[in-house]
Amino acid sequence: MKLYSLSVLYKGENKVHLLKSAYDVSSFSFFQRSSIQEFMAFTSQLIVERSDKGSRSSVKEQEYLCHVYVRNDSLAGVVIADNEYPPRVCFTLLEKVLEEFSTQVDRIDWPSGSPATIQYNALDSYLSKYQNPRDADPMSKVQAELDETKIILHNTMESLLQRGEKLDDLVSKSEVLGTQSKAFYKTARKQNSCCDIM
């Protein structure tokens, strides 16, 4: 999972222009980096130009996803990531960046601003912080912990059973379980196996 670009743009009546951007092109060849960076800036502008105000969307191009959020006040943000990166985290990042940008940079500067004139330097830190979505996003962290717990529980159950033993055999031999509990287990097992086939 990787983020390559984070940009803030202004969608004017006739033209979209870049206000500020940050790039991580370290995974590309040294000689390709400037061309890739230019292409990402061009793609970001094109996507914002073709998006409606007040919209969020994702555009797939080969193994990359471009996530765009255009606010009603014409301020827009674009994140370019690989297709494994969670879209929800991208839109959370865009919302956070655009909100912070709109409070730190005067609205009057947006239509005429450029990367050289806009005083906002947080994009690089956001781009590096959000490289790992689990660290940056609390929901992703909770989901990862739940997945780990599920794996641990599954492994623990398998390790409790002795070699060659099956849970089905243990249930049928059990003296503690009543016949109704055994019947419930068998019915549940059949229903679950039915669902696995589909």
Curated annotation (Swiss-Prot):
- According to its record, what are the GO cellular component terms? cytoplasmic vesicle membrane; cytosol; Golgi apparatus; Golgi membrane
Known EC number(s)? Answer: 2.3.1.-
In this entry the propeptide is located at: 196-198
The molecule here is called Synaptobrevin homolog YKT6-A
v-SNARE coiled-coil homology domain ranges (all copies): 138-198
Family membership: Belongs to the synaptobrevin family.
Q: What does this protein do?
A: Vesicular soluble NSF attachment protein receptor (v-SNARE) mediating vesicle docking and fusion to a specific acceptor cellular compartment. Functions in endoplasmic reticulum to Golgi transport; as part of a SNARE complex composed of GOSR1, GOSR2 and STX5. Functions in early/recycling endosome to TGN transport; as part of a SNARE complex composed of BET1L, GOSR1 and STX5. Has a S-palmitoyl transferase activity.
Q: Which SMART domains match?
A: Longin
The broad enzyme category this protein falls into is transferase
Write the record's keywords in alphabetical order, separated by commas: Coiled coil, Cytoplasm, Cytoplasmic vesicle, ER-Golgi transport, Golgi apparatus, Lipoprotein, Membrane, Methylation, Palmitate, Prenylation, Protein transport, Transferase, Transport
One GO BP: endoplasmic reticulum to Golgi vesicle-mediated transport
> Which residues pair up as cystines?
none
In this chain, where does the modification Cysteine methyl ester occur? 195
**Positions where lipid (S-farnesyl cysteine) attaches:** 195
* Entry comment on modification after translation: Palmitoylated; catalyzes its own palmitoylation. Palmitoylation is required for Golgi targeting.
- Write out the S-palmitoyl cysteine lipidation residues: 194
Q: Which Pfam families match?
A: Longin, Synaptobrevin
